[in-house]
């Protein structure tokens, strides 16, 4: 058995061919939908990203009894249930909050995980703009990397 769970911030399903859109071409989503089960009666009760992810992974409504935060020790998450039944789970995410203090219990429930760096405030491969202390035309390094 293979299980793939896709979560996107700010992706409107009405812009996807599998949901009836005929003017935006999404061939990869169409092919994925042909081999997938769609949960089209699943609604998030909490729309901020971390609470919505907790709801989608556990089936528990988040904002009714708590605010933004990590998975709780009593949460039975979908990735953890699959993992405990010998189904390999892997998380690939650019959602930096999984790895920050206060949200760091989401990824531990998977067998393995990978963080795509560089989103939001993640300073990986980001340098503040540097200003040369002289006329830049006089610098030896002309490509702008100091």
Question: What spans do the regions from the language model cover?
Answer:
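Conserved S-adenosyl-L-methionine
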Residues: 37-44, 88-94
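Short helix-loop boundary/capping segments at the starts of domains
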Residues: 13, 38, 62-66
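Short, surface-exposed acidic-centric catalytic microdomains
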Residues: 40-54
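Active-site-proximal N-terminal segment of extracellular/periplasmic enzymes that hydrolyze or transfer
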Residues: 1-37, 46
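Short glycine/serine/threonine-biased micro-segments
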Residues: 18, 43, 57
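Catalytic-site neighborhoods of secreted/periplasmic enzymes
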Residues: 53-146
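A short beta-strand-to-alpha-helix junction
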Residues: 22-25, 44, 69-76
């Amino acid at each position: 058995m293979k299980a793939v769970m896709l979560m996107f911030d700010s992706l409107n399903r009405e812009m996807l061919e599998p949901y009836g859109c005929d003017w935006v071409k999404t061939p990869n989503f169409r092919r994925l939908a042909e081999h997938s089960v769609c949960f089209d009666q699943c609604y998030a009760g909490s729309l901020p990203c971390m609470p919505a992810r907790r709801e989608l992974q556990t089936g528990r409504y988040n904002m009714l009894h708590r605010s933004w935060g990590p998975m709780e020790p009593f949460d039975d998450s979908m990735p953890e249930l699959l993992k405990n039944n010998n189904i390999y789970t892997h998380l690939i995410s650019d959602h930096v909050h999984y790895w920050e203090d206060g949200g760091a219990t989401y990824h531990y429930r998977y067998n393995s995980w990978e963080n795509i760096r560089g989103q939001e405030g993640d300073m990986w491969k980001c340098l503040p703009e540097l200003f040369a202390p002289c006329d830049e035309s006089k610098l030896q390094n002309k490509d702008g990397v100091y």
